Design a protein with these regions (language model features):
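Anion-recognition interface
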Residues: 2-454
Length: 454
């Protein structure tokens, strides 16, 4: 059963005839806390969510990821074939504000925003009723998951050395924001930053269940949205699975051998998404990474600090705070550096065979009968994908996506194609678009003016 400290049901449908404000749920992370699983559940059930009053702006999670990069001012790598993400945050928030019901924006790396970026994120969603959602887990399992994620992102730092670096910056506030781990996992600081302009009961902290099926995490997330989790189909496929001890060490050593000239975007698409996620993580019954004995006490202390901080705060807690306390360690610690050579060789052979199969399938694709898109939403998704990825449009998009008229046009197209019956043109919306929208716009009839809390 989901534990809700407020004891209140939070309805999903927020915009009804006569309502003053829309509602937007901003799911900001943290990474490695089941966020990918929750996003997969929502995007594979967007029609069922809409039936319960929850809308996902954009056409896929990629739109949320690109918007997050725009908000965080993430630099583009030279040669990256992906389209520019300049202006994507304004497009996504514009769609969320014009959604017919409550909207959800979800990207785990939003936790990496600095204070000015978080302030901009909140201001851009006014005058909506804004809710910030954060999922959290115990420190010990988080450390294991994050090191593996760094390895899947081309890192070469051994486990014990990486762990020492995280521990060395834990108490230095000026260095904390320079460490990626603490940038996205300094939970109490992240909550303070995002909650400065919204009521504390609009900040929802969800603990990741320590045991049990993945559906339990979805049930907690659905409780925050105010919808019935049982009416949503939860995918059976495992998402973002962890690597075995030998697989993680093999990938780390392979990263050391890769040429410096290989671009990061190529690594992400082929090594991380194919080799790590689809191949190495599927090798079952492999020994798993554990914390060294000397570091287990430190991880427990960090979990207790988080436990006490959330217990004393006024945020809306969903789940059990005891999920944040790691269970006692069991078994003998095995360092990744001491994995037997035969286990590394087995992982390497498995990886080489899978990459060869992937290359063959990529060069000899099976041609299937073209399927006609069904529904306006699917057609819109295919159309925008073609536009964003067409070679002849990339330069044009790079030069114009930041322009306000282009952003507003994309918002209008999304509204008309995804919810045509609820977005018929009217003078209020048309005037809003001409005036440029934003936080200083004149409210439409029936909509109150909302000011940011200072």
């Amino acid at each position: 059963m989901v534990s809700d400290r407020s004891g209140q049901r939070r309805p999903g449908k927020s915009r009804v005839p006569g309502a003053l404000r829309s509602r937007v749920y901003l799911h900001i992370g943290e990474p490695k806390t089941g966020t990918t699983f929750l996003q997969q559940v929502m995007w594979s059930n967007h029609a069922q969510l809409a039936a319960q009053g929850i809308v996902l702006p954009g056409y896929s999670h990629r739109d949320h990821s690109r918007a997050s990069r725009d908000l965080r001012e993430a630099p583009r790598v030279a040669g990256d074939p992906a389209a520019s993400w300049a202006g994507e945050w304004d497009v996504l928030t514009g769609q969320a504000l014009r959604a017919p019901w409550a909207a959800v924006i979800s990207d785990e790396v939003l936790a990496a925003c600095n204070p000015p970026q978080a302030d901009r994120g909140i201001r851009s969603l006014l005058p909506a009723e804004i809710h910030v959602v954060l999922t959290v887990r115990d420190t010990a399992s988080l450390l294991r998951a994050e090191w593996q994620e760094t390895v899947k992102c081309r890192a070469t730092v051994p486990w014990e050395e990486w762990l020492a670096g995280v521990m060395g910056t834990a108490s230095a506030a000026d260095r904390r924001r320079r460490s990626w781990f603490w940038t996205v996992h300094d939970t109490l600081a992240t909550l303070r930053m995002w909650s400065r302009h919204i009521p504390p009961d609009h900040v929802h902290v969800i603990t990741v269940p320590r045991q049990g099926p993945a559906e339990a995490l979805w049930a907690r997330f659905a409780a925050v949205l105010g919808i019935e989790s049982s009416r949503i189909d939860v995918p059976s496929a495992r998402v973002n699975c962890s690597l075995g001890l030998a697989e993680a060490e093999f990938l780390r050593r392979m990263n050391e051998a890769l040429p410096d000239g290989m671009p990061d975007w190529f690594y992400t698409r082929n090594i991380k998404q194919i080799l790590a996620h689809q191949v190495l993580s599927t090798r079952s019954a492999q020994p798993r990474l554990a914390l060294p004995t000397a570091q287990q006490e430190w991880a427990s202390e960090q979990s207790e600090i988080l436990f006490a901080g959330l217990r004393d705060a006024k945020y809306h807690l969903v789940g059990d705070l005891h999920d944040l306390l790691p269970p006692p360690a069991s078994g003998r610690y095995v360092s990744p550096a001491s994995v037997p050579t035969q286990q590394l060789l087995d992982a390497a052979v498995h990886a080489a065979a899978a990459l060869a199969d992937h290359q063959f399938r990529a060069s000899h694709p099976v041609r299937a009968e073209p399927q006609r898109p069904r529904g306006l939403r699917q057609r819109a998704s295919k159309l925008e994908w073609a536009v964003l990825n067409g070679l002849w449009t990339r330069r044009l998009l790079h030069n114009t996506s930041h322009l306000a008229p282009v952003r507003r046009l994309r918002v209008v197209i999304w509204c008309l194609l995804t919810h045509p019956a609820r977005h018929r043109p009217n003078p209020a919306v048309a005037g809003d678009l001409v005036d440029g929208g934003g936080e200083n716009r004149t409210p439409s009839p029936g909509r109150g003016r909302i000011r940011a809390r200072t």
